[in-house]
UniProtKB/Swiss-Prot annotation:
It is a multi-pass membrane protein. Belongs to the major facilitator superfamily. Sialate:H(+) symporter (SHS) (TC 2.A.1.12) family. Keywords: Cell inner membrane, Cell membrane, Membrane, Sugar transport, Transmembrane, Transmembrane helix, Transport. NCBIfam families: 2A0112, PRK03893.1. Catalyzes the proton-dependent transport of sialic acid. This is Sialic acid transporter NanT. It catalyses: N-acetylneuraminate(in) + H(+)(in) = N-acetylneuraminate(out) + H(+)(out).
Length: 496
């Protein structure tokens, strides 16, 4: 940013086309959030109608996470090859169809499959929308682009909670899913009315199509074994989360098998930069493990342990969702001011002060509970708005959509594990204590992984010849790229 423009308000650095691109992607992400959280709102109703156990009911939330890794890979590769816009539109259509299918589901298995479809669409929407907006905005505003965009998901959750309080008591839980068909109309409008991302257009102008992650894995030398491993991973995840396995050793073994498969895919597609990709998956895994027990099971906690009626539940969830949305925007400003990683760590540390009081206060004062949730979610969940910017900075434009989509959505399996883990712990403790304990302890793991820039640090330890020293999105240096105590002079920009 030149010195002549430093005193101009940030929003004046954006032209009409950039604002239109953001608005379209933000609305798409709002609809994504609306569709995705519906199952959490009606989980108790679905559990009662289908006669499910608590763990089975929680697995319906998990189902959408199980398929996300493949959706992120497939639709991310589409975004790298054919453009961010087409991938974004396709993703919206996919999760809308899955939501409609939930409304018609006759039982557990059908709804589980519909949730798998939603997960694929959600994964594609996350990767394509994030890269679309980030690559359309100026470099010095890209934390804001990321944070503002992800706020749409939280706003969608708030809207869903309000619609839930109006629709479900009158028409039942299935009517809520029928509303999910509306995003398809929006997707058709998007296809004709938004431009392609600037970075992608510049990178691909007059050039041959890039070799995507799908090309490497499913059209390359090892395509047969990779296809087999894909089916094995899908089957293993199915048995882990929907197969009612009671043996913890078998579940752990299947989880380890999936980890080996995903690491294999990362090594094949990323070459010498695989340590960075693997560490990014770990960052996202623990980010979901600390945040999603609350996201997924908060409605159940409010309805069962605090005995709130649907209207009160909707009001409390408004505070929670609105806090997360505000936090995404605040995180964008903090990220552009302090730097992405420093802003992330500071916000998470502040959120730790509030997590215990949220679940210790009980249900006697709804307004105090709502305010505590607002600030805790603003600091703890909202900062995840800049996670796409953080991850995307480790990938070049040619592989950013698939790289972001795959690493994020493999790590998002933590979101599949989180509600089940919370439900299992709640069998020994009350649900509120289980949620507070999980969130408080696992947040510190994320603080260490991001604060120490472990993706760059592990890359430097294992494959230093492929080390990237600067963020590919905003050109700022990675702190983990040089040994501690080396000083700023050690940062020499490299291309990789």
């Amino acid at each position: 940013m030149s010195t002549s423009t430093q005193n101009i308000p940030w929003y004046r650095h954006l032209n009409r086309a950039q604002w239109r691109a953001f608005s379209a992607a933000w609305l798409g992400y709002l609809l994504d959030g609306f569709d995705f959280v519906l199952i959490a709102l009606v989980l108790t109703e679905v559990q009662s109608e289908f006669g499910l156990t608590t763990v089975q009911a929680a697995s319906l939330i998990s189902a959408a996470f199980i398929s996300r890794w493949f959706g992120g890979l497939l639709l991310g590769a589409m975004g790298d090859r054919y453009g961010r816009r087409l991938a974004m539109v396709s993703s919206i259509i996919l999760f809308s169809v899955g939501t409609l299918a939930c409304g018609f589901a006759p039982g557990y298995t059908t709804m589980f499959i519909a949730r798998l479809v939603i997960g694929m669409g959600m994964a594609g929407e996350y990767g394509s929308s994030a890269t679309y907006v980030i690559e359309s905005w100026p470099k010095h505003l890209r934390n804001k682009a990321s944070g503002f965009l992800i706020s749409g998901f939280s706003v969608g959750a708030v809207v869903a909670a309000q619609v839930y309080s109006l629709v479900v008591p009158v028409w039942g839980w299935r009517a809520l899913f029928f509303i999910g068909i509306l995003p398809i109309i929006f997707a058709l409008w998007l296809r004709k009315n938004i431009p392609e991302a600037e970075d992608w257009k510049e990178k691909h102008a007059g050039k041959a199509p890039v070799r995507t992650m799908v090309d490497i894995l499913y059209r390359g030398e090892h395509r047969i074994i990779n296809i087999l491993m894909t089916f094995v991973a899908a089957a293993a995840l199915w048995f882990c989360f929907a197969g009612n396995l009671q043996n913890a050793a078998i579940v752990a073994g299947l989880g380890l098998l999936c980890a080996v498969i995903f690491i294999s895919f990362m090594v094949q597609s990323s070459g010498k930069r695989w340590p960075t990709g693997v560490m990014l998956m770990l960052v996202v895994l623990f980010a979901f493990l600390y945040s999603w027990p609350i996201q997924a099971l908060l409605p159940t906690y409010l309805k069962t342990e605090l005995a709130y009626d649907p209207h009160t539940v909707a009001n409390v969830l408004f505070f929670s969702g609105f806090g997360a949305a505000v936090g995404c925007c605040v995180g964008g400003f903090l990220g552009d001011w302090l730097g992405t990683r420093k802003a992330y760590v500071c916000s998470l540390l502040a959120s730790q002060i509030l997590i215990i009081p949220v679940f210790a206060i009980g249900g006697t004062n709804v307004w105090v509970l709502g305010l505590l949730l607002f600030f805790q979610q603003m600091l703890g969940q909202g900062i995840a708005g800049i996670l796409p910017k953080l991850i995307g900075g480790y990938f070049d434009t040619d592989q950013r959509a698939a790289g972001l989509g795959f690493t994020y959505n493999v790590g998002a399996l933590g979101g599949a594990l989180a509600p089940i883990l919370g439900a299992l712990i709640a069998q020994r403790l009350d649900l509120g204590t289980a949620l507070a304990s999980l969130s408080f302890s696992l947040t510190f793991v994320v603080i260490l992984l991001i604060g120490l820039d472990m993706p760059s640090r592990v890359q430097r330890w294992l494959r230093p010849e492929a080390l990237r020293t600067h963020d590919a999105i905003d050109d700022k240096p990675f702190s983990g790229a040089v040994p501690l105590g080396s000083g700023k002079g050690a940062f020499v920009k490299t291309k990789s």
